[in-house]
Amino acid sequence: MENSLFKKSEKKIRRALRVRKVLRGSSLKPRLSVVKTNKHIYVQLIDDSIGKTLASVSTMAKSSKASGLTKKNQDVAKALGSKIAELGKNLQVDRVVFDRGPFKYHGVIAMVADGAREGGLQF
């Protein structure tokens, strides 16, 4: 008999793989990955061709803590989206592939996407 928490985590891994099997980021069009936990939000620009993170921002970063972006809510998520768009513009990145992972495109995930779009990223 399997544990219900094991089943839940297994389903989460399957959802993430289902989304990521069609998404590939490159240096011209990196992958915008969004991960949320119970307390924090992490956003990264990833170049999958070399396996390197180009830029990242989160509610754990020192710059976010200094500007008061420490809680996990929709306002903070939108600010993180605009901040990652600004970092992407500094790297001459204007187009990205959005990777929502195993999460629904709703709430915090949607607000990160909206903030990134308002910041100038296209996807």
From Swiss-Prot:
Q: Which GO terms describe its cellular component?
A: cytosolic large ribosomal subunit
Q: Does this UniProt record's set of keywords contain Cell membrane?
A: no
Q: Which domain of life is it from?
A: Bacteria
CDD domains documented for this protein: Ribosomal_L18_L5e
Q: Name one GO biological process term.
A: translation
Coiled-coil stretches are: none
Alphabetized SUPFAM superfamilies for the sequence: Translational machinery components (SSF53137)
Which GO terms fall under molecular function for this chain's record? 5S rRNA binding; structural constituent of ribosome
Q: Which InterPro entries match?
A: Ribosomal_uL18_bac-type (IPR004389), Ribosomal_uL18_bac/euk (IPR005484)
* Assigned keywords, A-Z: Ribonucleoprotein, Ribosomal protein, RNA-binding, rRNA-binding
Q: Which family would the database say this protein is a member of?
A: Belongs to the universal ribosomal protein uL18 family.
The record's subunit annotation is: Part of the 50S ribosomal subunit; part of the 5S rRNA/L5/L18/L25 subcomplex. Contacts the 5S and 23S rRNAs.
Record function comment: This is one of the proteins that bind and probably mediate the attachment of the 5S RNA into the large ribosomal subunit, where it forms part of the central protuberance.
What name does this protein carry? Large ribosomal subunit protein uL18
